């Protein structure tokens, strides 16, 4: 019984210790040309938070094929990290204020038209902080 009570109270203890998480998502972008970087809308907490980011979970969804050479970065106001794949985790933002918004930056190197265009259906992050 004590074990279950402890498990039930853990989220409250974590909250009291200043730990938490926020989630945000947005619709994606359409990238029609190589050599041009496009940014998602800022993904930010819906309520004020305090603390420093720890583990960040990302996810994005494409409509259609992934262009060869696609580069995707996840950026705060103070730093960026390259991400690989449509979902994953990173600790690259450890120490960044949890209130800072994040953005996905999309780019396919080269020049000329991108056929078919890169269509990002959605972007999302879950930011854990303490």
Show where each model-derived region lies.
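Disulfide-rich extracellular domains of secreted proteins
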Residues: 16-130
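Short, intrinsically disordered low-complexity segments
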Residues: 1-2, 72
